[in-house]
């Protein structure tokens, strides 16, 4: 027993700084970024800015660019040979063929749910007349979104030497596209049957729900040998929205991309939540005016933060950096400093602090007592002189 205690003490002193609340989950994905959509913060990342191949996740960009150039997604037209010309027959994932009566909606669902290269390529050819021109639109949109590590060469996502992106950039594209009503409806759909009734296909949402990811609202898969298994998704749990992008998972029949996402989602959904770290009216700091009046600096708002459930408010520190004494130059609303809320060395929140009062001239108590005393002495002296003068007259 004594030996065991010695060993435990040795371990404790050799490894004193291990964080028992460290994030932990098993994944094979090489690149990950998880956004909290409630506050647009990144809450987990792994090689998020590494330039990689992203496979069919780039069909998100193909689809949103197409939607923004289509007047009516229910418009019917016949597939023509040029819309499929040059596409490898193995890439005809949906099965669209020359002469088939389709709608833009069919092509969009085929692109996002079935991940059909024939859907993406046909959209590009129909809208721009050539894939090259359509890809120019995709790159223009990437530039508009401020994506500095993304460049497209084709519309369908097959690997090209000069085609690349990052999981972070894919997340930004997904966030942008999801704000479009048509895109959101399509990518959130379980399954779809084309307008001619020839094809029915399930999407990532249905697959995710079958695998136990019941919080999964929308998603797009991707795979090439170089990119590995990829997945971008949007989920929600307990009023918190998430956007997760994973890439480079080990290809297998075990759906490693979905398993990785489940492990990440489950960890954060079970161990993290939003809560107030300071409430409106809570005291930040007690300071004084030049005239010794006390001034209470208080929080102007509730501040909510997404934190590990094992971190409590008593573990947080409020640090004020600003004026400790206010002089007559200070008016209500003047900036007098800033404050931070910290957990260990991590800054959770930072805000400017403004004076709640206008400082007015006021005699300090000790000065006032001195003045009263002097006035009293002077008054008594004057009385003494008056009395003395009267006595002299009588004499």
Describe every region a protein language model picked out.
Residues 22-181:
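Active-site-adjacent loops and short helices of periplasmic peptidoglycan-processing enzymes
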Residues 16-21, 63-66, 283-285, 303-308:
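Intrinsically disordered, low-complexity boundary segments flanking structured domains
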Residues 13, 23-25, 235, 329-330:
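Sterically constrained small-residue positions within well-ordered secondary structures
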Residues 10, 17-19, 59, 108, ...:
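A generic alpha-helix preference that emphasizes hydrophobic side chains
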Residues 147-148, 159-164, 168-395:
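Domain-terminus/edge residues, biased toward the C-terminal soluble/receptor-binding domains
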Residues 2-22, 369-388:
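Sec-dependent N-terminal signal peptides of Gram-positive bacterial secreted proteins and lipoproteins
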Residues 2, 97, 101, 105, ...:
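Juxtamembrane/transmembrane-helix boundary motifs in multi-pass membrane proteins
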């Amino acid at each position: 027993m004594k030996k065991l205690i010695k060993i435990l003490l040795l371990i404790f002193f050799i490894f004193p700084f291990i964080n028992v609340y460290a994030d932990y989950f098993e994944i094979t994905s090489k690149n990950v970024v998880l956004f909290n959509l409630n506050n647009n913060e990144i809450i987990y990342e792994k090689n998020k800015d590494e330039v990689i191949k992203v496979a069919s996740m780039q069909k998100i960009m193909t689809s949103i660019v197409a939607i923004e150039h289509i007047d009516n997604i229910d418009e019917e037209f016949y597939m023509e040979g040029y819309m499929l010309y040059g596409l490898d027959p193995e890439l005809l994932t949906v099965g669209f063929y020359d002469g088939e009566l389709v709608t833009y909606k069919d092509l969009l669902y085929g692109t996002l749910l079935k991940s059909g290269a024939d859907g993406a390529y046909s959209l590009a050819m129909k809208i721009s007349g050539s894939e090259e021109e359509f890809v120019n639109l995709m790159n223009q949109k990437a530039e508009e979104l401020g994506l500095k590590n993304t460049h497209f060469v084709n519309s369908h996502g097959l690997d090209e030497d000069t085609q690349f992106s990052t999981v972070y950039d894919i997340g930004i594209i997904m966030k942008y596209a999801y704000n479009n009503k048509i895109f959101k409806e399509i990518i959130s759909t379980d399954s779809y049957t084309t307008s001619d009734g020839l094809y029915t296909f399930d999407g990532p949402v249905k697959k995710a729900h079958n695998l136990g990811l019941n919080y999964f609202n929308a998603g797009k898969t991707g795979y090439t040998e170089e990119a590995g298994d990829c997945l971008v998704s949007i989920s929600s749990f307990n009023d918190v929205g998430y956007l997760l992008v994973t890439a480079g998972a080990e290809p297998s029949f075990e759906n490693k991309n979905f398993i990785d996402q489940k492990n990440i989602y489950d960890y954060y959904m079970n161990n993290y939540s939003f809560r107030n770290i300071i409430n409106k009216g809570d005291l930040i700091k007690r300071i004084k005016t030049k005239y010794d009046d006390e001034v209470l600096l208080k929080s102007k708002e509730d501040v909510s933060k997404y934190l590990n459930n094992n971190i409590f408010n008593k573990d947080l520190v409020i640090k004020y950096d600003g004026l400790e004494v206010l002089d007559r130059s200070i008016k209500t609303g003047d900036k007098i400093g800033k404050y931070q809320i910290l957990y260990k060395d991590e800054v959770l929140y930072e805000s400017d602090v403004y004076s709640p009062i206008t400082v007015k001239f006021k005699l300090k108590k000790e000065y006032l007592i001195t003045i009263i005393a002097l006035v009293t002495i002077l008054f008594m002296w004057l009385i003494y002189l008056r009395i003395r003068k009267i006595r002299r007259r009588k004499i």
